[in-house]
C-alpha cells in the first residue's frame, strides 16, 4: 500500500481524502495557495507546502509547482480529487512518468473518456448508445442547423471538453444557431482552454441517472449503485440520491451492465462514473467521469463501501475487496450540496466571505463532508461548495424527513447558503413523488419566495498581511515570511520553521512561517 499521498486539491474533497488516508495509516501531503494557507485541509494534513498565487491557475493548476512538491515531499502517490487536474491526461502522465502512482484511471482511459465526442464513439463501439448526436467537432453554425433539421428542434451544443453545463447552449430554432454556436465556443475556451463543440438531440424531460463503477488492475470491474442527480439548476447538481426513485429493477441491471461494458472498453480501472439520461423507459449514454464524483458519499452510505479507501487499494495494486455478487445495498441516501450562494428569489448570487459560525447537524444517519469550519473564509476565486450534507434512512421517506430535520438544524452564519432552496426542493410534492427531471428546478419549481440566510456578523476577521522575518533555528539563520493580523504588523514576530514543510496546526492560525514554501 502507498506510504505517502499528496492531495492535489483543496476544500472538502481534500479533507475527505486526508481522513481516508489517516484511517489507513498513510501519511498525507497538502498543497495550498496564498488564500488557503489556513484552510482546513492544510490543518489536517501531516505536511503542507505552499504553491503561492491566488487564482487556481497560479496554484492548484500549476503542474510544475505540484511536481516540485511531489519531489520535495517524497510522496509516492497523488490523489487528484475532483476538478482541477482530476481528468487531465497530461498531468496523469507527468505523475506516472516520475514513478509516482496516480490514484485514478490510466492516462489512456482519461484521454478516451475526457473528450465527450471520443467517449460517445467508444461507448457506441461497445454497444452502448448515446443521445443521437455528431461524432465530429462542429466547424460552424450551418452544421447545427443541418442537424436540427434532420433530428428536430431543440438541439444542444456542448463543449467537448466541458462539464457542469458550461459551454452548453440549447438551440430551439434555426435563427438561434449562430449566436449559440459562438457563445458555446467562447465559454468553452474560457472555462476549459478548448473550444471544440458538438451537437446532440435535446431531450425534453429527462432524468439524470449515473452509475458508480470501480475496477482494479486484476481484471475485476463492478457497478455498485445508481445515483439520481436530476435536481439541477443550470446543469449544476443540487441534490443527489441513491437509489433512484421509480426506477425499474430491470433498467437498473441493464444500466449497471452497460456502465461496466463502457469501462472495460477503454481499459478502465479505479473509480469512475458513467452518466446516462433516462426518459420514456430508455437510457442513453451521456459521458463518463474518470474521477471520484462530488456525490460519491450517497453510494457509500447505501453500500457500506469506502470508495476513497478502495481507490487507494486499487492504485496500490491490490484487488477489489468485494465482488459484484457480494455488494448489498441498504436503505436510501440523499446528498445536499451546501454552497455559498444567496438563493433569495431564486437568483443564487455568489456569497463569498468569512464564516463566523458553522455547526453542522448531527444524529443517526447524518454525515457532513465539509471543507470549512467556523472562522474560515470562502474565497471568490474558487468553487463555493462549503460542504455536503448526506443523510441515510431505511427508506426514501425516512431519508427525506431526516434530511429536512438536518437542514433546519444546520447553523452557518456570516455567509448566505443554498439551504432555503434545498428545503424548498425536498418539501415539494414533485420531489417527494420522484417525478422531477433535469428541467424541473428551472421550469417548475417556484423559488421566488425563497429568502436569504445572510446574517450580520458580530465582527469581520481581521485581514492578515505578509511580513518577512529572520529567524534562527539550531544556529542557522533563515529568512521566512509570516502572515499576521494587520494590527500586529508592526510587532516583532518570534518563531519560525525551517525547510520546505511544517507540521500544520490543527487549531488554525497562520502557523508561524506558514506550512511549507519556506525559503530554507
Regions of interest found by a model, annotated:
Residues 508-520:
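Structured functional modules or segments
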Residues 259, 297-504, 510:
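Catalytic cores of soluble metabolic enzymes centered on carboxylation/carboxyl-transfer
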Residues 1-274, 278-295:
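N-terminal beta-alpha lobe that positions the nucleotide/phosphoryl donor
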Amino acid at each position: 500500500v502507498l506510504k505517502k499521498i499528496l492531495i492535489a486539491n483543496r476544500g472538502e474533497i481534500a479533507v475527505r481524502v486526508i481522513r481516508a488516508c489517516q484511517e489507513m495509516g498513510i501519511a498525507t501531503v497538502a498543497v495550498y495557495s496564498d488564500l488557503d494557507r489556513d484552510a482546513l485541509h492544510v490543518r489536517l494534513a501531516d505536511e503542507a507546502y505552499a504553491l503561492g498565487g491566488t487564482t487556481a491557475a497560479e496554484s492548484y493548476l500549476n503542474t510544475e509547482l505540484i511536481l516540485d512538491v511531489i519531489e520535495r515531499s517524497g510522496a509516492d502517490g497523488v490523489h487528484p480529487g475532483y476538478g482541477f487536474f482530476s481528468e487531465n491526461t497530461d498531468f496523469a502522465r507527468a505523475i506516472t512518468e516520475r514513478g509516482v502512482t496516480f490514484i485514478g484511471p490510466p492516462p489512456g482511459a482519461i484521454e478516451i473518456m475526457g473528450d465527450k465526442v471520443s467517449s460517445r464513439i467508444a461507448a457506441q463501439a461497445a454497444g452502448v448508445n448515446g443521445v443521437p448526436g455528431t461524432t465530429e467537432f462542429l466547424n460552424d453554425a450551418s452544421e447545427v442547423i443541418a442537424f436540427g433539421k434532420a433530428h428536430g428542434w431543440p438541439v444542444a451544443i456542448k463543449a467537448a471538453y466541458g462539464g457542469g453545463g458550461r459551454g452548453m447552449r440549447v438551440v430551439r430554432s434555426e435563427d438561434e444557431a449562430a449566436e449559440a454556436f459562438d457563445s458555446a465556443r467562447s465559454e468553452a475556451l474560457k472555462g476549459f482552454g478548448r473550444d471544440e463543440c458538438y451537437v446532440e438531440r435535446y431531450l425534453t424531460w429527462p432524468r439524470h441517472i449515473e452509475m458508480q463503477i470501480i475496477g482494479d488492475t486484476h481484471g475485476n470491474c463492478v457497478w455498485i449503485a445508481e445515483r439520481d442527480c436530476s435536481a439541477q439548476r443550470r446543469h449544476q447538481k443540487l441534490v443527489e440520491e441513491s437509489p433512484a426513485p421509480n426506477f425499474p429493477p430491470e433498467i437498473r441491471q441493464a444500466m449497471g451492465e452497460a456502465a461496466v461494458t463502457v469501462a472495460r472498453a477503454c481499459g478502465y480501472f479505479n473509480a469512475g462514473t458513467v452518466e446516462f439520461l433516462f426518459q420514456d423507459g430508455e437510457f442513453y449514454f451521456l459521458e463518463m467521469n474518470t474521477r471520484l464524483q462530488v456525490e460519491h458519499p450517497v453510494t457509500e452510505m447505501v453500500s457500506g463501501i469506502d470508495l476513497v479507501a478502495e481507490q487507494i487499494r486499487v492504485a496500490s495494486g491490490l484487488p477489489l475487496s468485494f465482488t459484484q455478487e457480494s455488494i448489498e445495498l441498504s436503505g436510501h441516501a440523499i446528498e445536499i450540496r451546501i454552497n455559498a450562494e444567496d438563493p433569495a428569489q431564486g437568483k443564487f448570487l455568489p456569497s463569498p466571505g468569512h464564516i463566523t459560525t458553522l455547526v453542522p447537524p448531527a444524529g443517526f444517519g447524518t454525515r457532513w463532508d465539509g471543507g470549512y469550519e467556523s472562522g474560515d473564509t470562502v474565497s471568490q476565486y474558487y468553487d463555493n461548495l462549503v460542504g455536503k450534507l448526506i443523510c441515510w434512512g431505511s427508506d426514501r421517506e425516512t431519508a427525506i424527513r431526516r434530511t429536512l430535520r438536518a437542514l433546519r438544524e444546520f447553523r452557518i452564519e456570516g455567509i448566505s447558503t443554498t439551504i432555503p432552496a434545498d428545503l424548498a426542493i425536498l418539501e415539494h410534492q414533485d420531489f417527494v413523488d420522484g417525478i422531477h427531471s433535469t428541467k424541473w428546478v428551472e421550469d417548475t419549481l417556484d423559488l421566488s419566495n425563497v429568502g436569504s440566510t445572510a446574517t450580520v456578523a458580530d465582527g469581520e476577521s481581521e485581514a492578515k498581511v505578509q511580513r518577512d522575518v529572520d529567524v534562527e533555528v539550531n544556529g542557522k539563520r533563515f529568512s521566512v515570511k509570516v502572515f499576521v493580523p494587520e494590527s500586529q504588523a508592526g510587532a516583532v514576530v518570534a518563531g519560525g520553521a525551517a525547510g520546505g514543510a511544517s507540521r500544520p496546526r490543527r487549531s488554525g492560525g497562520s502557523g508561524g512561517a506558514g506550512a511549507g514554501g519556506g525559503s530554507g
